[in-house]
């Protein structure tokens, strides 16, 4: 049996930002602690995975050595956006492209690898996002979370967060919809309106 394993390398500041906690702007990080632990576990298990890296973390010089160690130990790296905003799907196409490109460059600078895989923060995706990824020659996107419990996950998140009513409104599609629970669990291909099958 074949399996694909990946990990979203969401840093401390990204959780603080999404939850509405003060102090995230100083980008507190625990990457220097958790990445070596993950890598040691994966070495012991003799498995290689894909780490989806947030561009903002890769842009911070103090994180570059630990992010480079991911590639040095034989793992793949993917793009997890630059700003890790779970409302990415609400961005204009131009803003999405800027977000993807900015993360690509930061991840390349930190790791020496170009990204060809993407996962949206908070499993955020849109047709515009997929078209941007296609244009930029990405080979796969893992932003879709095919589960029926997305609305429950979102409500729990709102309950536990310190977000204002307006912030909650901007995140109302976080984790996807009930309808997305009907998408396949195995890889599949998107066909865009301007494409032929």
Pin down the residues of each PLM region.
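Residue-level recognition of hydrophobic positions within alpha-helical transmembrane segments
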Residues: 4-7, 95, 137
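Generic detector of short, locally flexible boundary/turn motifs and exposed helical patches
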Residues: 14-18, 42-45, 81-85, 106-108, ...
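Active-site-adjacent pocket scaffolds in enzyme catalytic domains
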Residues: 113, 120-197
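Active-site beta->alpha N-cap acidic-glycine motif
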Residues: 1-73
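Amphipathic alpha-helical segments that form well-ordered structural scaffolds
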Residues: 34-37, 41, 102, 106, ...
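Short, hinge-like loop/turn segments at secondary-structure boundaries
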Residues: 23-24, 68-70, 95-97, 134, ...
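Metal-dependent polysaccharide deacetylase catalytic core of the NodB/CE4 family, i.e.
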Residues: 45-128, 139, 143-154, 196
């Amino acid at each position: 049996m074949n399996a694909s394993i990946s990990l979203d390398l969401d840093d401390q500041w990204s959780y603080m930002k999404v939850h509405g906690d003060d102090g995230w702007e100083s980008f507190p990080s625990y990457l220097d602690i958790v990445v070596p632990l993950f890598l040691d576990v994966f070495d012991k298990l003799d498995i290689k995975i894909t780490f989806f890296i947030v561009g903002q973390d890769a842009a911070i010089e103090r994180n570059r050595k630990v992010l480079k160690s991911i590639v040095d130990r034989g793992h793949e790296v993917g793009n997890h956006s630059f700003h890790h905003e779970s409302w990415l799907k609400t961005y204009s196409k131009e803003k999405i492209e800027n977000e993807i490109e900015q993360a690509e460059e930061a991840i390349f600078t930190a790791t020496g690898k170009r990204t060809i895989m993407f996962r949206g923060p908070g499993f955020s995706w849109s047709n515009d996002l997929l078209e941007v990824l296609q244009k930029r020659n990405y080979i796969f996107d893992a932003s879709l979370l095919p589960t029926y419990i997305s609305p429950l996950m979102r409500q729990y998140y709102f309950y536990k967060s310190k977000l204002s009513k307006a912030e909650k409104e901007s995140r109302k599609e976080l984790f996807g919809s009930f309808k997305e629970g009907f998408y396949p669990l195995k890889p599949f291909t998107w066909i865009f309106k301007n494409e032929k099958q």
